[in-house]
């Protein structure tokens, strides 16, 4: 969990009672989608056996799963599986630690999970090879050297080039938007551009992190520093991916804390000249060998049909990756574990995929899609959990209107734990390839991410 997530939870203590509920949404939904086909948005009256199904039939079928729902909640909340996913995750992150793309730790994490899934008794557990980026940040620092000496909290962005060993020392130009940068293009030449953009939502504001270096390079800047993409801060910079363009010069780029960005903005507004020295030892190495991890519970009636649940195993290098995305990966595993422990056998194959190199732009997911897209008609729904796991509120869903109606019926079964909402836009980095080709998809939603990431689509507090 990031410092910003902790800060949010401090002001929302009344929600801690949902601790035992944090994974139930994903688990229930996984069971139910195995029992009937969403089938890429096909009409409701299509079924594998060719008989006519009405919406009323499907409503009644879903309602009949209430006893299964009770069994799952009893096992997960009160039974032997109580807190199991949390304990599994805690052990994993304590032993393995950060899991950066291309790192030895990620390799160890994949080996660990491969063995754990086999030991858990899941079926068809195997590894699928992937080539992934290998970038290391090295030593890095930033310092205001004029008008005072002040150390800047800084984290280089993934894939950034480094600076010369002596660093880059240059005057700063502070801007609040790309438009302002372009208006001041003449002033930006030879300077370090500092973005002090206004925070709207993560989805909108993250463009400054992704494109900040490119836009600054276009106007001749030497480097770019971006205010971390968050409305909350305890002088804690965030890292993340950024994207260069082939026809634009590459310049070093990093995120700085909200406090340091606003400090320089105040200085600049007074007309004070600001000079910064930036040092980054970042290096990019040849692509490394890695793997997506796959495990299944094979379907009893339509084994060729796939319901995919997923989370990514890699993380950034400056934390344990417990929430991004250890939590998502482990509740996805827990979904299969609960079904197996209860002796349930879904009609369709329930497939778990733990992605590699998501933080580098969904590399593992893209290669998985390319490998399996010829069988796309067999994928009934794709799911990922990468937006937090505590305090669930519902699902963000993308699919046909008829499929959405079915999802809403399923979610009614979660009323006892108050997880019933169905939001728009279920896209996620690792499932977008399938969704764009017409496969229904959803992402798990929780209170924090609704407020922090999706302000325009989630109103929950």
Give each language-model segment a name:
Residues 253, 261-262, 302, 317, ...:
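Metal-dependent peptidase/peptidase-like ectodomains
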Residues 25-40:
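Cleavable N-terminal signal peptides of Sec/SRP-targeted secreted and luminal proteins
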Residues 64, 68, 147, 151-185, ...:
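Soluble metallo-hydrolase cores and metallopeptidase-like ectodomains found primarily
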Residues 82-106, 114-124, 183-187, 191-207, ...:
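Catalytic-core environment of secreted peptidases
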Residues 64-69, 81-89, 96, 105-113, ...:
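Stable alpha-helical elements in mature extracytoplasmic
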Residues 44-70, 74, 78, 90, ...:
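Noncatalytic luminal/extracellular "stalk/propeptide" segments of secretory-pathway proteins
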Residues 337, 348, 449-461:
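His/Asp/Glu-rich mid-to-C-terminal helical/loop segments that flank catalytic regions of hydrolases
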């Amino acid at each position: 969990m990031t410092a910003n997530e902790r800060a949010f939870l401090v002001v929302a203590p009344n929600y801690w009672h949902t601790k035992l509920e944090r994974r139930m949404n994903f688990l229930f939904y996984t069971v139910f989608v195995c029992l009937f086909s969403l089938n890429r948005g096909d009409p409701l009256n299509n079924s594998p056996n060719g008989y006519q199904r009405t919406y009323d039939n499907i409503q009644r079928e879903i309602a009949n799963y209430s006893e299964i729902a009770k069994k799952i909640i009893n096992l997960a909340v009160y039974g032997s599986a109580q807190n199991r996913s949390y304990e599994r995750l805690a052990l994993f992150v304590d032993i393995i630690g950060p899991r950066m793309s291309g790192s030895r730790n990620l390799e160890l994490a994949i080996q660990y999970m491969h063995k754990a899934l086999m030991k858990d008794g899941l079926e068809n557990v195997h590894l699928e090879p992937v080539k992934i980026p290998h970038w290391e940040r090295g030593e890095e620092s930033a310092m205001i050297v004029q008008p005072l000496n002040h150390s800047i909290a800084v984290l280089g962005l993934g894939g950034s080039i480094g600076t010369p060993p002596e660093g880059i020392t240059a005057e700063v130009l502070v801007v609040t938007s790309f438009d302002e940068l372009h208006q001041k293009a003449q002033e930006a030449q030879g300077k370090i551009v500092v973005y002090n953009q206004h925070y709207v939502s993560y989805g909108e504001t993250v463009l400054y992190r992704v494109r900040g270096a490119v836009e600054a390079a276009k106007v001749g800047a030497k480097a770019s520093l971006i205010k971390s993409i968050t409305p909350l801060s305890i002088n804690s910079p965030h890292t993340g991916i950024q994207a260069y363009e082939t026809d634009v010069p590459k310049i070093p780029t990093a995120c700085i804390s909200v406090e340091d960005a606003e400090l320089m903005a105040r200085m600049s507004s007074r007309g004070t000249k600001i000079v910064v020295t930036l040092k980054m030892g970042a290096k990019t190495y040849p692509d490394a060998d890695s793997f997506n991890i796959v495990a299944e519970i094979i379907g009893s009636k339509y084994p060729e049909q796939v319901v995919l649940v997923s989370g990514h195993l890699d993380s950034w290098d400056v934390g344990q990756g417990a929430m991004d995305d250890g939590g998502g990966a482990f509740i996805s595993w827990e979904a299969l574990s609960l079904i197996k422990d209860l002796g349930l056998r879904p009609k369709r194959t329930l497939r778990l995929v733990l992605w590699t190199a998501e933080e580098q732009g969904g590399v593992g997911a893209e290669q998985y899609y390319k490998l399996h897209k010829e069988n796309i008609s067999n994928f009934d729904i794709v799911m990922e959990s990468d937006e937090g796991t505590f305090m669930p509120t519902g699902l963000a869903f993308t699919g046909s209107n008829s499929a959405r109606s079915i999802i809403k019926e399923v979610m009614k079964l979660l009323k006892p734990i108050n997880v019933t909402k169905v939001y728009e836009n279920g896209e996620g980095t690792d499932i977008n390839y399938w969704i764009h080709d017409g496969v229904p998809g959803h992402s798990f939603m929780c209170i924090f991410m609704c407020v922090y990431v999706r302000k325009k689509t989630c109103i929950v507090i």
